[in-house]
């Protein structure tokens, strides 16, 4: 023995010292997004969007004004913070009141400038009132960078894709706390939530791990009454925890939002083996050899089944749960190894005083009385158990799921408070993206389809502030034409692109090669149910949209196809307009659209508008020939708008013009008259509908010179346009985590049940024995799921671990109970064997169950809601599992008397 000690103890010591350096390398990761593997298609798309559009994660720093933000002090602070944030490595862009693009109409056309340049902040109330009115009139600003009530201003920060976003968020927060002065500041967005999650995990590990050891110490001391005994029981789990954390540190595997409970799980679970060994040690009069020979197989089987329980988590689709399963199962093996090798050696050298023969651990006498009742009753125990089982089964179907990280924080936590504030004032901070891939994003057809999809999305209440390149083009076109619509020609679109090309806001929504573009939007409700609903709604909208179109010039329509194509075009736009203005009057909309091509009900309106526009044109410097004589100008204009041959009128009155100038003038006049026709049509037919502004924009767009219809194979003319459209974002990633959570629960549960059943069947050399061994476990699992349904406790990333833990740990109790009964039944009757089992093995099971239950109960002092629930649920299920093993299993054995028990 001394020779073994000479090599063994230094070996353990040196390994422990080495691995302790790994703990110094251990990192904390509070990002629930890491739950999904990086190869998940939605994660890959989300990352690709981040790489191509200057990041995919946004954070918001929100300043609260006193009484509002429209004052010089607040604007200066916003300008200062914005400039400071832009200097931080990992920040790709910042948008704020003092650094956001504004599009304004000026006499010469359109001006692109900053909304409020940092060096030109208003000085007085009148200027601020004017600025406030202007900002609140703009969709791009109101509710985006300033709340509608004017009380809050946001600085929207886009995080670079390949930087440590948590580190960047930490630097932003540090800098803000230094610079904020007396302003109240809020931080929102997933990077800040992840930062808070990591900080919470770090605090919980430092707080809960010592607390768990303390609770275990008290329970074990009450049981064994000797400090040395308790100290020896602690050595295997303490060494195991050190080793596993060291290995994780060296392998660069961080403690996640799931595995942060590992420092509690290892000591709580691992102490069970020492408890059984010490109990056997005292039973056999401190004869360590006899004690070891009697107990090592049950301990080994308990350890292997617990190992299998945690290892079953590798079959999940969620990386954080998979890694937790791998390293916790290895930690269990370490505990088993140290308990069966190191602990017997220590027991042979340490003298431990003999504990009382009478079982005096407080819960034991009470449990003994219950055992006497159970022995005497015939069917009461099984009847009550069956009733509980059936009720639990009913409530299983009411279980809900929750993976949204916001829900992990309590309602009083700053993260939750800020999230609710941002949801109320700014619509949220969780981004969603719709990615378009086309040949050329200067094509008006693509922009029109993008605009239509955006309008569909804006009707959905949980999605806010959608923005795309079509918004910017539409906004600029509105300043020129009066209609927020997409121009007909690519040339006009290119002219508008030229004005905004290279601006930070544009680079975030369209690629430099104009082949890819985004619709981006935000949501904010921290509920998985809503995240699922959002992602499904977006997918529903996208699935309805055709991905292939034909564009045809109205003037070049073949005569034989003209009527059919116009009807198809009208049907297509009828559907668009109907959905956009929420009208059910399909026939009315269709008749209105058809009238543009078939009659001149609005001819007078067209002439009225055309007269005004031509009057303005011939009086401007832009005209090829300016008419100064007002009387003559009116005569010429009247003749032009009533003539079927404009060229003849022009030759009549402008004889000195060259033919090429006449041709140019004719084209310009025709364009003006056509625009008048469009505007006349819009004004005439929009007045009978609600939501007039949106309808006007669509009617104006409809009356352009290019027809758009979904692709049809029988048409062999026109320009074909194909689009690839993809959706990604935080809601759909949460949905993916949610879907995988359910799969993970089912897969891990089935796998651990199969593995444990195989182990115990081999142990008892009987399939019937394996079935009986599973009775307490299956009862506890059904009871656990029933609790979730009855108390409306959602299945989340933490309690998805509980079912495998119930099996992995709970089978321990069953193995020890069955081992003892099988041993005693050879010499005693069932009742006597049961009594002896309870007196000799029952204490170890009760002590083990209570140490595990109370050890996990310390998690209620954590900050994460799922971790609190995890602690409570494990506490309840460990008690139920041990009671089932001690009372329910023997009752079934007593009633059925299976043959395997006597083999």
Regions inferred by a protein language model and the residue ranges of each:
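Soluble periplasmic/extracytoplasmic beta-strand elements of cell-envelope proteins
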Residues: 58-62, 95, 145, 154-158, ...
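Short beta-strand elements
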Residues: 58, 89-101, 132, 142-144, ...
């Amino acid at each position: 023995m001394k020779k073994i000690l000479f090599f063994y103890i230094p070996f353990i010591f040196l390994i422990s010292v080495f691995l302790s350096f790994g703990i110094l390398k251990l990192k904390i990761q509070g990002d629930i997004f890491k739950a999904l593997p990086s190869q998940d298609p939605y994660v890959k798309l989300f990352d690709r969007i981040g790489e191509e559009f200057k990041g995919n994660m946004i954070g918001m720093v929100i300043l609260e004004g006193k009484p509002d933000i429209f004052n010089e002090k607040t604007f200066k602070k916003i300008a200062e913070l914005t400039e400071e944030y832009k200097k931080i490595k990992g920040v790709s862009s910042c948008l704020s009141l003092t650094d956001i693009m504004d599009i304004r109409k000026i006499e010469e056309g359109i001006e692109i400038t900053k909304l409020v340049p940092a060096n030109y902040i208003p000085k007085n109330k009148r200027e601020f009132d004017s600025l406030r009115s202007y900002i609140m009139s703009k969709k791009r600003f109101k509710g985006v960078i300033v709340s509608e009530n004017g009380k809050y201003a946001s600085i929207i920060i886009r995080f670079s894709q390949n930087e440590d976003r948590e580190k960047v968020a930490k630097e932003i927060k540090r800098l803000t706390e230094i610079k904020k002065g007396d302003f109240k500041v809020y931080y929102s967005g997933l990077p800040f939530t992840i930062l808070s999650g990591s900080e919470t995990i770090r605090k919980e590990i430092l707080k809960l791990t010592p607390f768990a050891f303390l609770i275990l110490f008290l329970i074990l001391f009450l049981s064994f009454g000797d400090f040395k005994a308790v100290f020896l029981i602690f050595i295997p789990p303490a060494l195991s925890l050190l080793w596993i954390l060291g290995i994780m540190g060296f392998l660069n595997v961080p403690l996640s939002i799931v595995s942060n409970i590992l420092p509690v799980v290892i000591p709580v679970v691992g102490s069970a083996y020492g408890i059984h060994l010490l109990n056997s040690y005292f039973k056999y009069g401190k004869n360590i050899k006899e004690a070891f020979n009697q107990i090592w197989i049950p301990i080994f089987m308990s350890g292997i089944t617990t190992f299998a329980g945690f290892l079953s988590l590798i079959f999940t689709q969620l990386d954080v749960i998979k890694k937790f399963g791998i390293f916790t199962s290895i930690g269990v093996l370490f505990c088993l190894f140290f308990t069966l090798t190191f602990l017997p050696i220590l027991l042979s050298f340490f003298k431990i005083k003999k504990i009382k023969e009478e079982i005096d651990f407080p819960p034991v006498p009470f449990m003994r009385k219950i055992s006497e009742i159970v022995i005497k009753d015939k069917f009461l125990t099984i009847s009550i158990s069956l009733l509980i089982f059936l009720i639990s089964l009913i409530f299983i179907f009411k279980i809900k799921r929750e993976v949204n990280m916001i829900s992990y924080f309590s309602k009083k936590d700053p993260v939750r408070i800020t999230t609710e504030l941002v949801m109320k004032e700014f619509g949220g901070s969780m981004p969603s993206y719709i990615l378009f891939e086309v040949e050329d994003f200067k094509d008006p057809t693509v922009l029109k389809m993008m605009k239509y999809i955006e309008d569909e999305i804006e009707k959905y209440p949980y999605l806010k502030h959608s923005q795309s390149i079509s918004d910017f083009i539409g906004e600029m076109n509105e300043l020129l034409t009066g209609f927020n619509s997409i121009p007909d020609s690519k040339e006009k679109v290119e002219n508008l692109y030229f004005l905004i090309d290279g601006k930070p806001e544009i680079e975030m929504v369209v690629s430099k090669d104009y082949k890819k573009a985004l619709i981006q939007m935000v949501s904010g409700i921290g509920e998985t149910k809503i995240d699922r609903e959002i992602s499904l709604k977006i997918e529903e909208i996208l699935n309805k949209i055709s991905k292939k179109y034909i564009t045809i010039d109205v003037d070049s329509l073949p005569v034989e196809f003209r009527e059919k194509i116009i009807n198809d075009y009208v049907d297509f736009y009828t559907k668009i307009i109907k959905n956009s203005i929420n009208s059910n009057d399909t026939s009315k909309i269709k008749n209105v659209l058809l009238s543009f091509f078939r009659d001149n009900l609005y001819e007078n309106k067209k002439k009225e508008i055309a007269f005004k526009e031509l009057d303005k044109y011939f009086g401007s410097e832009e005209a090829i020939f300016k008419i100064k004589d007002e009387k003559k100008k009116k005569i010429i204009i009247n003749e032009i708008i009533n003539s079927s041959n404009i060229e003849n009128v022009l030759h009549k009155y402008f004889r000195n013009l060259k033919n090429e100038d006449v041709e140019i003038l004719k084209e310009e006049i025709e364009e003006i008259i056509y625009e008048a026709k469009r505007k006349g049509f819009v004004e005439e037919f929009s007045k009978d509908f609600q939501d007039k502004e949106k309808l006007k924009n669509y009617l104006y767009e409809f009356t352009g010179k290019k027809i758009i219809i979904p692709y049809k194979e029988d048409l062999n003319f026109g320009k074909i346009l194909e689009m690839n459209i993809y959706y990604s974002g935080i809601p759909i990633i949460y949905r993916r985590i949610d879907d995988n959570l359910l799969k993970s629960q089912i897969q891990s549960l089935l796998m651990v049940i199969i593995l444990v059943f195989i182990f115990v069947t081999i142990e008892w050399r009987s399939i019937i024995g394996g079935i009986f061994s599973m009775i307490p476990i299956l009862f506890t699992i059904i009871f656990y799921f029933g609790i979730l349904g009855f108390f409306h406790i959602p299945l989340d990333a933490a309690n998805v671990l509980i079912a495998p833990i119930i099996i992995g740990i709970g089978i321990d109790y069953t193995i020890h109970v069955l081992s003892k009964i099988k041993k005693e039944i050879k010499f005693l009757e069932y009742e006597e064997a049961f009594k002896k089992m309870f007196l000799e093995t029952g204490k170890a099971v009760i002590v083990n169950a209570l140490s595990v239950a109370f050890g996990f109960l310390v998690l209620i002092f954590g900050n994460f809601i799922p971790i609190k629930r995890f602690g409570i649920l494990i506490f309840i299920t460990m008690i139920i599992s041990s009671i089932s093993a001690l009372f329910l299993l023997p009752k079934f054995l007593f009633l059925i008397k299976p043959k395997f028990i006597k083999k």
